């Protein structure tokens, strides 16, 4: 059963198609949206407190019975979570898998995604939910702050995914997606240059140090939240620039068989910005050491 497409209004960049992405800070708060009613779940910790009060009021002696009640409540809460998950899976099987059985049967034999998506691990920004990717559409990598490490650095799961998707799956597009209020970017902006080297988070987000430096150079007078928003977008472009440092990626981009794109999802006002790397114009900027050029910028709102 084909889903009815959602229509968006698209406004195109009024500037030259090869101009650099305008990274100026935009308003954080957008229009109000209607609220969706959700089912209230009472946390297990609150239920335990209520149970304790009931025991005290009834005059019963706290002990093994009280402890057993707490364990039972925890188990019930855990069961509720997986019951919900089970129902979502069964709904998927009935409404999608069985309704498009031939497609899923073909996917069981092979995959041929058109996109490699590099997105943040943040639970609020699932690219499949936000952009409607279906199984088989996009090979997806998610890490803190949607960063691309330098080609020269050691092996990482992100670099392995790049190699596999580009050289084996032959994806036609790489889309790096950043987002508003990114905790990884906030950690990067707060981080001291000589931070705790034992921290996994520090050792990862330092990959985006160049974006932090460029943000501090042009936006140091702004409020910290606005600096972070600036860095969120700057980091996307620095990751796109890094991708061109992978020889086999740059070769395919040069041949025209692979395109690099940036995206920024603002979940505060539900807008999405998209742009594409202009490789020809970026080559000149690479020689100048001034970053990349972009084209085809649009805002979906």
UniProtKB/Swiss-Prot annotation:
Molecular function via GO: carbonate dehydratase activity; zinc ion binding
Keywords: Chloroplast, Lyase, Phosphoprotein, Plastid, S-nitrosylation, Transit peptide, Zinc
Domain of life: Eukaryota
EC number(s) on file: 4.2.1.1
Tissue and organ expression note: Strongly expressed in aerial tissues including leaves, stems, flowers and siliques.
Top EC group: lyase
Described purpose of this protein according to its UniProt entry: Reversible hydration of carbon dioxide.
Record's protein name: Beta carbonic anhydrase 5, chloroplastic
């Amino acid at each position: 059963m084909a889903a009815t497409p959602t229509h968006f209004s698209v406004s195109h960049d009024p500037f030259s198609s090869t101009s650099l992405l305008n990274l100026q800070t935009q308003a954080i708060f957008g229009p109000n949206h209607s609220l969706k009613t959700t089912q209230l779940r009472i946390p297990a910790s609150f239920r335990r407190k209520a149970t304790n009060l009931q025991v005290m009021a009834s005059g019963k002696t706290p002990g093994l019975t009280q402890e057993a009640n707490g364990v039972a409540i925890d188990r019930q809460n855990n069961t509720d979570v997986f019951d919900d998950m089970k129902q979502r899976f069964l709904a998927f099987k009935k409404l999608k898998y069985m309704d498009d059985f031939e497609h899923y049967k073909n996917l069981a034999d092979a995959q041929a995604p058109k996109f490699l998506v590099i997105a943040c691990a943040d639970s609020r920004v699932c690219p499949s939910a936000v952009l409607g990717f279906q199984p088989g559409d996009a090979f997806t990598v998610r890490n803190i702050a949607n960063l691309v490490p330098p080609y020269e650095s050691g092996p990482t799961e992100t670099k392995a995914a790049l190699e596999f998707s580009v050289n084996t799956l032959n994806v036609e597009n790489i889309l790096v997606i950043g987002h508003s209020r990114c905790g990884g970017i906030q950690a990067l902006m707060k981080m001291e240059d000589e931070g705790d080297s034992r921290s996994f988070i520090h050792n990862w987000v330092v990959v985006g140090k160049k974006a932090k430096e460029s943000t501090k150079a042009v936006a140091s007078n702004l409020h910290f939240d606005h600096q972070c928003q600036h860095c969120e977008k700057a980091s996307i472009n620095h990751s796109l620039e890094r991708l061109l440092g992978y020889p086999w990626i740059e070769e395919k981009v040069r041949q025209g068989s692979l395109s690099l794109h940036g995206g920024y999802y603002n979940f505060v006002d539900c807008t999405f910005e998209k742009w594409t790397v202009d490789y020809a114009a970026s080559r000149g900027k690479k020689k100048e050491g001034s970053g990349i050029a972009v084209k085809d910028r649009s805002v979906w709102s």
